Structures are given as C-alpha cells and as structure tokens.
C-alpha cells in the first residue's frame, strides 16, 4: 500500500489531498484539506474518514514556505502513523507549448516552467514555490506536475490562434485555456457514471473566484473561454474576463498607469469587485440590496449565458445539450445554486 500527496497551491491557501493505492487497486481518495496561510497560527481544515477537524500548525510563513511544509509534513506523517508518502502531485497551471501530459519534476523542468510565470502570475509562482519547498523537505520524494493547460491541447489549431502576426503565434502567443484539471475530472466522472452523456456535445462551466467555460465533445476540449492568460473569458471575482485591448492602452497612455499598476488592476480590481465596488464575494453581493451589487451579479450571469450560448457553441456545437458546473458556487440552505445563469434567456 502506498500513499500519495497532492497539492493545489494558491497565493493564500494550499489545498491538499491524500490518496491510497495498491498494486491491484485503483487510486482512492483518503483525506483532504485546506491550509490557510493568511492567519496566525496557521489553520489546516482537514477531512478524514467522514470527520472534520481544524488543526493549528506552529509555523511562520516565509518566502520559501520552508517552515510551513516542514510542519505540514510532520503532522501528516504522524496522522498516518509515520508512514512515508511515495510521491507528490502538483497542479501547475501553465504547461506552455512543451508540456501536454503529467511530467516528473527535476531542476531543469522546474526552471522551464518558471519561465512561464509571466503568463500566469497569480498561479505559476505559487505552485513552483511549493514544489521547491517539497524538494528541500523531502529531496528523495518523486514529484509530478499536472497541467491545467494540457486538457485543451485537443483543440483545433484554428481555435488556438489569435489574429496577430504569425511569428508571435509560433513563439507561443496563442490561446491555451485553463481549469483543465477541473474539466478533466468532470470528463472522467462522466466516463464512469454517465458514458452516454459524455458522448454528447456539452458546455461545462467552472465557476469560482476564477471562472471559465469549456465546450466538450466526446469528453475532450474543443474550445474554452479563457485564452492566452487567465484574464480572458467570462467575468470573475476580481478579473474582468473578455476586455477590449484598447482599455489597457487607454489607461497606460491617458491615465499614466505603469505595467505593474495595470497588472494589479487587471488581476485584482475588476470583475465582481470592480463592478460592485463592494466585494469580490458573490455571497456578499447576493445578500446586498445595493443596486451596484445586483448589477455585478446580473452582468456575470448575462456574460456567462452569452458566451455559453452564442460564443463557443456557434462554431462547434449546433445545439446546447447540457450545462454542468464545477468550482465553488454559492448555494442556499437546501444546497441549490444561488447564481442562476439564464442560458435559455438569449
């Protein structure tokens, strides 16, 4: 029996999973948790065997995450009776042109992935920082990277191209798409539980702080709303989604914004937060009576419906057959989604 750790590193949280496998069995989930790096002492919310517990870890958050990973691994190994883990898997957002499948990580590959950090500045550095922290803490532990962009490599060349000079496209300035591990998980679930549904043409939505749509056919990606970066597509918590390229030019030329200020604005000041002026949290906006909050939610729903019905499907999906959700969508006390996207309203 072997146990595998999985990580999804963000700028303020680390999501982790523990999986178990035997030679004759499929890998099965054993436990999971979220480590919040924003509070002191650190809080690990952990689910195992149907029970939930909150653990305080005595570790300081440093730039290299060294103390955090040491404390986390010590607690996990004690929790599972001192048994060492056999491998660690990481969600790495961007695989660029060269990585279209999971890959064993070594220094050379980590350095190549770090070169992609400007394309995913919120996610790539955080993921690689955790990889390096694990390397220092457990240098002999094999580590694997799984890429969000890899799922979308099945798209036709025309879908990945933008109307820019060919030389830039060949250098890698093209549409990649993201949230691929989420979409791959949905496809795998359908393959096991609803194979007839998987064979159809679907539009799937990943709705969380980051949000996107994916057009699938036979369980593979044919188009997606995100493109070159995780800024594109439908509106998000703090990101604008699709935006006329003239807007950043205007802000730079007429308002004097620097490149760093533009990046901060695009990644942290737009979306639900920017439209409402109240919050990036859809739950807060749904409970608010402010007209700005209602407008932010209405815009999100309109743009999502527009892209799901008039965007991707117009090229590859003649009739929209099903809409599925992944991610963290606010629900009411009965578990029903509180964000209702009027797909048939257009």
Residue ranges and their predicted role:
Residues 74-86, 190-196, 308-318:
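Phosphate/pyrophosphate-binding loops at sites that engage ATP/ADP/AMP, CoA/4′-phosphopantetheine
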Residues 151-254:
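Glycine-rich phosphate-binding loop of actin/hexokinase-like ATP-binding domains
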Residues 75-123, 142-144, 150-161:
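Short beta-strand-loop/turn "lid" adjacent to the catalytic site in phosphate-handling enzymes
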Residues 264, 268-311:
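Adenine-nucleotide phosphate-binding core of ATP-dependent small-molecule kinases
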Residues 4, 13-62, 227:
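Short glycine-rich, Thr/Ser-proximal phosphate-binding strand/loop in the N-terminal lobe
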Residues 317-346:
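Structural signal for terminal/edge beta-strands and the immediately following C-terminal loop/tail
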Residues 4-6, 87-89, 144, 202-206:
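Short glycine-aspartate micro-motif
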Residues 244-247, 251-278:
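Oxyanion-binding "anion nests"
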């Amino acid at each position: 029996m072997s146990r595998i750790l999985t990580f999804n590193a963000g700028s303020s949280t680390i999501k982790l999973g523990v999986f178990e496998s035997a030679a004759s069995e499929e890998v099965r989930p054993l436990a999971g948790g979220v480590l919040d790096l924003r509070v002191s002492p650190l809080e690990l919310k952990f689910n195992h065997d149907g029970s939930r517990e909150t653990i305080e870890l005595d570790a300081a958050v440093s730039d290299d995450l060294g103390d955090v990973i040491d404390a986390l691994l010590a607690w996990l190994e004690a929790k599972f009776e001192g048994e060492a883990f056999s491998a660690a898997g990481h969600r790495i957002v961007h695989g660029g042109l060269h990585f279209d499948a999971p890959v064993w990580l070594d220094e050379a590959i980590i350095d190549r992935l770090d070169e992609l950090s400007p394309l995913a500045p919120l996610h790539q550095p955080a993921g690689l920082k955790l990889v390096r922290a694990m390397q220092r803490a457990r240098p002999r532990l094999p580590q694997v990277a799984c890429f969000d962009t890899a799922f979308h490599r099945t798209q036709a060349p025309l879908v990945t191209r933008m109307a820019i000079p060919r030389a830039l496209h060949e250098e890698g300035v093209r549409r990649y798409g993201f949230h691929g591990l989420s979409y791959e998980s949905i496809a795998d679930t359908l393959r096991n539980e609803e194979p007839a549904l998987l064979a159809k043409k679907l539009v799937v939505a990943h709705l969380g702080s980051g949000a996107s749509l994916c057009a699938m056919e036979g369980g593979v990606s044919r188009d997606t709303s995100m493109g070159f970066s995780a800024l594109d597509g439908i509106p998000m918590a703090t990101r604008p989604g699709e935006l006329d390229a003239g807007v950043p030019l205007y802000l730079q030329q007429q308002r004097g914004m620097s490149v760093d200020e533009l990046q901060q604005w695009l990644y942290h000041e737009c979306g639900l937060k920017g439209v409402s002026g109240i919050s990036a949290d859809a739950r807060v906006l749904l409970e608010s009576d402010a007209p700005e909050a209602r407008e932010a939610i209405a815009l999100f729903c309109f743009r999502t419906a527009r892209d799901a019905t008039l965007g991707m499907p117009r090229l590859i999906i003649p009739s929209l057959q099903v809409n599925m959700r992944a991610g963290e969508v606010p629900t009411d006390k009965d578990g029903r989604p509180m964000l209702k996207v009027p797909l048939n309203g257009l």
